[in-house]
């Protein structure tokens, strides 16, 4: 897929009542303390399969639905096209995301992930799960609701071993189809694979390996990488 612009930006937006939550969120997820500026250049996201350089856009607004109305205008199309991901920090019971997501997602680039981070501590995980069920097949984009409680740690997985909270957001970024990532050598990947591995880790590794495989343009190199990773992961299956 050829894009007119490089998709190497992640936008983190909060409405004004939750600016403090955004500050801690940026520190916890991106280890970013430069919250007083709107653009933090050349950040690095790295896992065992690849690393990618991106710019972190930080913003706040009085009202997210009003911000969305401006964001989906034709004038903002160049901005939308460079967004690898958009993270909205809000109270989902106040924002009513079901109403704004329809128009928002029609305008968003199809390779942009969207995460709505709920900071209302009265919202239970069952309510988040229900929203994710509704939106899971609505668009081709990754759209996910995540509970994040600043005052107390969020349980990082459910009864099925699926990631929750910040761990789930990290997983979304890890498995995003980055178009400008630097693939790490297969030898380094093999060195980092432990002797024992839980099933959920195997699944994450398969997802990341798929991303690397798709980024290798030479078919022979891609096939060689696939065979190497199949051999490595077969030890744990």
From Swiss-Prot:
Alphabetical list of InterPro entries matching this protein: Irc6 (IPR034627)
Function noted in UniProt: Involved in gross chromosomal rearrangements (GCRs) and telomere healing.
GO biological process: vesicle-mediated transport
Organism: Saccharomyces cerevisiae (strain RM11-1a)
A GO molecular function held by the record: protein-macromolecule adaptor activity
Key words of the record: Chromosomal rearrangement
Family in the record: Belongs to the IRC6 family.
Keyword check for DNA repair: no
Protein name: Increased recombination centers protein 6
Taxonomy of the source species: Eukaryota, Fungi, Dikarya, Ascomycota, Saccharomycotina
Domain of life: Eukaryota
Gene: IRC6
